Regions:
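Hydrophobic alpha-helical bundles that form the membrane domains of multi-pass transporters
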Residues: 261-341, 345-346, 360
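Structured, solvent-exposed hinge/loop segments at the ends of secondary-structure elements
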Residues: 32-153, 162-167, 218, 425-529, ...
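Hydrophobic alpha-helical transmembrane segments of multi-pass inner-membrane transport and secretion
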Residues: 13-40, 262-299, 402-427, 657-691, ...
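Mid-to-C-terminal secondary-structure elements
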Residues: 115-127, 139-263, 475-651
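Small-residue-rich transmembrane alpha-helices
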Residues: 30, 34-37, 239, 288, ...
Length: 785
């Protein structure tokens, strides 16, 4: 108890240094806790899945087109999985662009079609009603979607009409799990409603304990025909991927990009690095300032050792003082986190909720951090000579060197953060302002066809009705005075599409992305034709390659460019080659860092439910009003979903913007923490030199000489830290961007700017104290010192 009281008394007496130390550690801990909570949330995605390491999703690889699916869709080669190995089986079909109608109003929804077994494997909180999918008309809604449709009204038992024309009865309302989920949906309908949709189902298995998954995956790696090889020689393989890995497997293609979230391990590595840098900066600052306050007690420790004090008592005293500081710092850190919760949620694009992890994290900090921060002070004073401790009260060359060394390491870490922040901002600026190679301005991407996706309801009458509505829509589009060009398709110009291998006349093959386009496509997006020409109204399919595809197939000119699909060649060895009519300029149809994708364009009248529409400047609202009237006249509801291509392209760099913002914020906090440490150290060091300054002034030293004397040491530390940090930062940035096709140069400008930024802020921190010291009255100091 006496030791605790003594520790509190000592910290209270050194209140200036205690407050500085407390603030520096609190800011560092707050940053680290925020990042660790985010990293933990990313690493625990889909933990609402019971035993996610034993629940597996099926991944199908159809000749390079990899995605979540089911081998049940391919009936030619039978796949046999021993039923004794399967504990639970379910499947779900994602319908991203689905809709329901309530009282004549259309509501767009992300739907999954599944059975009750799905909810045995994946736990969702039930807020109202019951989880029941035993009837064909049963439907479950997520809370947010139910509120959007019904407001505060109780939706249980209410009827809504699905896009397939059938009425559904709301059985239950679901909440969101506390963890992040890779699958997002608004509505759940029963597999008994229909078994055939326009999207493939994804099979989910829970295998019995002891099942050899590696053996099953070896069985799945054997190529099998997707269909009868007489007319389709494509082959597929399958594998079982545990749910804990699905979120990280972004190689799986998904046409439902708003229903599936994927994580980035490289992003987690970056955030882990930032977290460690912030933690080290805070800890070094904390230990350095604490050691500085302990210098005043050198005589006390020396005398205690002479009179037989043991190391245990010394360690307990140091540990208690550190624990008290860390407890208060942790409280301030959580206060900071609570106050900044809304902007942090926006920055990290997540919704943090308090979980047991927060408690364990705080407990871990309280248990481990005092031990870590107590080790060096204990070793220094416990194993040092008592005579040296007595002689070095307040000042010694050795203590000055150790303080400057700690400060230097802090500045190395700060420079790494600042340089990284500057580089990532430059990279982001490059990404946002580099033209992708196609027109993005005044392009509307809209879903205008709203028909049933239920193939069980297919009939000739329904087909004719849908065809008539689509024809009426196209006629209205052609008649619109606010449309320059339009293209109907399934994917927009920047979305993933299907691909396959193509072979040239020499037998060389390359994987090409396939896009089905109209002749207007190239004019609408201002894509230059470099060789050949594209017919205005092709009588049959015409093929066009981009420059990247020409390079991939080793074509030097259009004259030698002819290809055949590998699938077709395997089916018929004498299959004719398709000549290439034109070569177009490369453009970036995804993230710039991935480069241009080798693409073959099949130019025909093929179309889909999505329309890409180019409109004149200033006609956006006129176009939207026209389309709403058109939708009202054809489908009876004016609502439709749309985006603008310019916004879609910017959204490609959403994660880059997040990383750049994180670096900016945490680099500034690192500078602030380092400056707090610098302020505390300089407050102590300069005060110790008042007598020296007074003597120098008495002997005629001018203000310039004193400024040089007092600034010199800190400038030397800053310069040395910069020299060490530059090659480390260069290496880390170079390694991270090694695979980027488009990247900002690592010029000296960012290093010089980082030096100026840190130096100006740091020297500004010092200026007040140095100016005060340089203006002291020598006579007053000589009397009091």
């Amino acid at each position: 108890m006496k030791t605790l009281i003594y520790a509190i008394r000592f910290l209270a007496r050194s209140k200036s240094y205690t407050i500085i130390n407390l603030l520096g550690l609190a800011f560092s801990l707050a940053c680290c806790i925020i990042l660790m909570r985010y990293i933990h949330r990313e690493l625990t995605v889909d933990t609402h899945c019971l035993d996610r390491e034993q629940v597996y999703a099926t991944v199908i690889d159809l000749e390079g087109n990899r995605g979540l699916s089911s081998f049940n869709d391919y009936q030619y080669d039978t796949v046999r999985i021993d039923q004794r190995h399967i504990e639970h089986y379910t499947e779900y079909t994602p319908l991203e662009k689905d809709f329901v109608i309530k009282e004549g109003e259309r509501f767009f929804t992300r739907t999954i079609v599944t059975d009750s077994t799905f909810f045995h494997l994946f736990q969702y909180p039930l807020l109202q009603g019951r989880i029941a999918l035993d009837k064909a008309e049963s439907v479950l809604l997520k809370k947010d979607f139910a509120t959007k449709m019904f407001g505060k009204e109780n939706p249980i038992g209410k009827t809504i009409r699905h896009s397939n024309g059938k009425d559904l009865v709301i059985e239950g309302i679901l909440g969101e799990p506390t963890c992040k989920t890779s699958l997002q949906f608004d509505m759940v309908i029963s597999t008994t409603l229909s078994t055939r949709w326009d999207r493939s189902a994804t099979s989910i298995y829970r295998f019995m304990p002891g099942t050899d998954i590696e053996e099953l995956n070896r069985y799945g790696s054997i190529p099998r025909y997707a269909n009868d090889p007489q007319w389709d020689s494509r082959q597929y393989t399958f594998s079982f991927v545990p749910m804990k890995d699905v979120y990280w497997d972004d190689s799986t293609n998904s046409a439902e990009d708003t229903m599936f979230f994927y994580g980035s391990k490289s992003q987690i590595s970056i955030l882990t690095g930032v977290c460690l840098l912030m933690l080290l900066t805070g800890l070094l600052n904390f230990v350095n300032l604490y050691l500085m306050t302990m210098l005043r007690r050198g005589k006390e420790y020396g005398l205690k050792k002479i009179y037989g004090a043991n190391g245990k008592n010394l360690f307990i005293q140091i540990w208690l003082e550190n624990t008290l500081l860390i407890v208060w710092a942790l409280l301030f850190a959580w206060l900071f986190i609570e106050v900044t919760q809304i902007p942090i949620n926006r920055l990290l694009n997540t919704n943090f909720v308090y979980t047991p992890f927060d408690g364990w994290l705080s407990l871990g900090i309280l248990l481990l951090l005092p031990l870590v921060t107590s080790c060096y002070p204990f070793l220094k004073y416990n194993y040092g000579s008592p005579i040296r401790s007595i002689q070095s009260i307040g000042w010694s060359n050795r203590s000055v060197r150790s303080r400057m060394c700690f400060l230097g390491i802090q500045y190395i870490l700060t420079f790494l953060l600042v340089v990284s922040a500057l580089y990532f901002n430059r990279q982001l600026d490059l990404l946002l302002h580099t033209e992708p190679g196609f027109r993005t301005k005044n392009i509307l991407v809209a879903n205008l066809v709203y028909e049933s996706r239920d193939f069980n309801n297919f009939s000739e009458q329904r087909y004719l009705q849908e065809r008539a509505r689509t024809q009426a829509l196209n006629e209205k589009i052609l008649a619109c005075p606010f449309i320059e060009y339009h293209q109907s398709c399934y994917e927009s110009i920047i979305e993933k599409t299907y691909g396959t291998n193509y072979i040239n006349a020499k037998g060389e093959s390359a994987y090409l992305n396939i896009m089905y386009v109209s002749p207007q496509f190239f004019r609408m997006f201002d894509i230059d034709i470099e060789e050949g020409s594209i017919p205005e109204k092709p009588e049959r399919s015409t093929y066009v390659l981009n420059r990247a595809a020409m390079k991939a197939l080793n074509f030097s000119s259009l004259g030698e460019a002819a290809v055949v699909e590998d699938n077709r060649k395997r089916r018929d060895a004498n299959a004719p080659m398709s000549t290439i009519s034109a070569v177009v300029k490369d453009y970036y149809n995804g993230h710039l860092t991935a480069g241009a994708v080798p693409t073959i364009y099949e130019v025909s009248g093929f179309g889909g439910p999505r329309y890409q529409i180019a409109y004149p400047e200033g006609r956006k609202q006129d176009l939207l009003n026209y389309l709403k009237e058109t939708m009202k006249g054809i489908y009876g509801a004016e609502e439709f979903t749309y985006t603008f291509l310019e916004d879609d392209v910017k959204a490609l760099y959403k994660e880059d913007q997040k990383i750049a913002s994180i670096y900016n914020i945490f680099a500034l906090i690192a500078i602030a923490v380092s400056c707090l440490g610098l302020f505390g150290i300089s407050l102590f060091d300069i005060r110790q030199r008042y007598r020296e300054i007074a003597i120098r002034k008495a002997h005629g030293a001018g203000m310039k000489n004193l400024y040089q004397l007092l600034f010199k040491k800190y400038l030397a530390v800053l310069g040395a830290s910069f020299v060490v940090a530059v090659p480390i930062a260069y290496y880390l940035i170079h390694q991270y961007t090694a695979d980027f096709v488009v990247k900002a140069p690592i010029g000296m400008g960012i290093f010089v700017l980082a030096l100026l930024l840190v130096a100006i802020i740091s020297m500004g921190t010092l200026y007040w104290q140095i100016r005060k010291a340089a203006n002291i009255d020598p006579a007053t100091v000589m009397k009091t010192e």
